[in-house]
Amino acid sequence: MSLAFNVGVTPFSGQRVGSRKEKFPVQGFPVTTPNRSRLIVNCSLTTIDFMAKMKENFKREDDKFPTTTTLRSEDIPSNLCIIDTLQRLGVDQFFQYEINTILDNTFRLWQEKHKVIYGNVTTHAMAFRLLRVKGYEVSSEELAPYGNQEAVSQQTNDLPMIIELYRAANERIYEEERSLEKILAWTTIFLNKQVQDNSIPDKKLHKLVEFYLRNYKGITIRLGARRNLELYDMTYYQALKSTNRFSNLCNEDFLVFAKQDFDIHEAQNQKGLQQLQRWYADCRLDTLNFGRDVVIIANYLASLIIGDHAFDYVRLAFAKTSVLVTIMDDFFDCHGSSQECDKIIELVKEWKENPDAEYGSEELEILFMALYNTVNELAERARVEQGRSVKEFLVKLWVEILSAFKIELDTWSNGTQQSFDEYISSSWLSNGSRLTGLLTMQFVGVKLSDEMLMSEECTDLARHVCMVGRLLNDVCSSEREREENIAGKSYSILLATEKDGRKVSEDEAIAEINEMVEYHWRKVLQIVYKKESILPRRCKDVFLEMAKGTFYAYGINDELTSPQQSKEDMKSFVF
């Protein structure tokens, strides 16, 4: 296959992005220039060309790749590498049938404890991670021999192997998985030392290790794809014994395909930002003189969390809802009076374009009408998607979160004494993840029954994701207050210092809360990775990516209040 590149400078047209089933038109790898033009790279590679070539690499010459395909065991390591590459570059969705077939065969070999899996540390760790994430029952005890560095060093220590052990250990879903805890502990120390000592000669590999160590749980699919496009190097897998299935696939094949896919996503993202800004102005939200301006960061987080470019409307719905939740939170938290907050809740419960009573202020009218019109629009779109009305359900979710905001306001205003456990049991409802996640699920191509939406599984998944967000936000706020020398502590931190009638330091309280974050994160993974489930995996993945987005937003710094890392990342999202 030839790759013919034609380079020219063309203004970004903003035209509709074509289907991935079409031959790629002139797709841009945009490079910022003073006149705001973009460098366009025209490639003759087609989606079908590359996918056909990839699918050929997944099978033997005499295979038709039927459902019952049994692959040669010696092919598994290289096929796992291909799967990992496709996932890292964010294009695995185009090869799910082939990936599932390979993982079925890998699981069979895992159960047999076949030497092709168990005879190589890197293959063993990668197989564990890929199988667990897909919901296969694999015991972490099989990785117990790698629980200390000395044991691994005797098997020829190399950096990619340790990275794979680190990634596998991050898939710990049960408290009792001590072997993964041990692996994560020593690999983290080892990799940190390698970075600090500047001991990694390969610059790309050095940056990859830095990226993983900075905030591993906060790596969404799209964020990971962007970084791996920059740092991609097939020699990363050279330690694996393979049948050279990559021989007729050069790095450019992978990169051109993945960059074209990413470029489609980013073109849609830019269009989505324009639509979001127009909506924000049309709702007159730009005239309000309080609260955080989160339009850009909300659009960016939506693009990180909703990665499939077929879901451009879903990203817009997600971003609009995130903006509204933030504005309402700010209104209840620091601007509106208790009476005004009660009024907003009454208006939402009534849900009329022309309410029976007066608004009382222009701000209340702007807030309610923005919410009213937006929810009605989203509900109508969801009705088409679901084949039934979900407006009442969405309005109830808004009443729920606004009522939770009011309870928190009253608790603070009235000086109500609350224990840490009381706070934890109710505070998750004031986190926007449940509302935003349940709304987003309406648009991902799955018909949702009341049984599914009201199920214990759905409630638990939303609750655990919300708790991750609530607790991370509180810890982040506490750290910011400490750095800025602001009096007072984040509420949960304050309560945690006096938990169970004992007095502990703020640092001890934060450590305990971080342990709680890990607990709820593991619960999220348990529910998402479980195969026997009332919710389809596509729906659960919405909440999984939201949880990752929460780690991204609050894992290091409060990116909604004072964006730092996100600003740098947004710049880097332009090739």
Curated annotation (Swiss-Prot):
Stated EC number for the protein is 4.2.3.141
The gene designation is: SCS
Name by which UniProt lists this protein: Sclareol synthase, chloroplastic
Q: What is recorded about the protein's domains?
A: The Asp-Asp-Xaa-Xaa-Asp/Glu (DDXXD/E) motif is important for the catalytic activity, presumably through binding to Mg(2+).
Chain segment of the transit peptide:
1-51
Q: Which pathway does the database say it acts in?
A: Secondary metabolite biosynthesis; terpenoid biosynthesis
Swiss-Prot/TrEMBL keywords: Chloroplast, Lyase, Magnesium, Metal-binding, Plastid, Transit peptide
Gene Ontology biological process = diterpenoid biosynthetic process; gibberellin biosynthetic process
Which species does the entry assign this protein to?
Salvia sclarea
* Positions in coiled-coil regions: none
Q: Which residues bind Mg(2+) 1?
A: 329, 333
Q: Which domain of life is it from?
A: Eukaryota
- Please state the protein's primary subcellular location: plastid
* Catalysed transformations (reactions): 8-hydroxycopalyl diphosphate + H2O = sclareol + diphosphate
GO MF annotations for this entry?
A: magnesium ion binding; terpene synthase activity
Biotechnology section = Escherichia coli expressing SsLPS and SsSCS from Salvia sclarea and CrtE from Pantoea agglomerans can produce sclareol in high-cell-density fermentation conditions, thus being an alternative, sustainable, and cost-efficient route to sclareol and other diterpene analogs. Yeast (S.cerevisiae) engineered to express S.cerevisiae GGPPS and Salvia sclarea LPS and SCS is an efficient way to produce sclareol in a scalable and potentially industrial way.
Q: Where in the cell is it found?
A: Plastid, Chloroplast
Q: Give the family per the record.
A: Belongs to the terpene synthase family.
Q: Name one GO cellular component term.
A: chloroplast
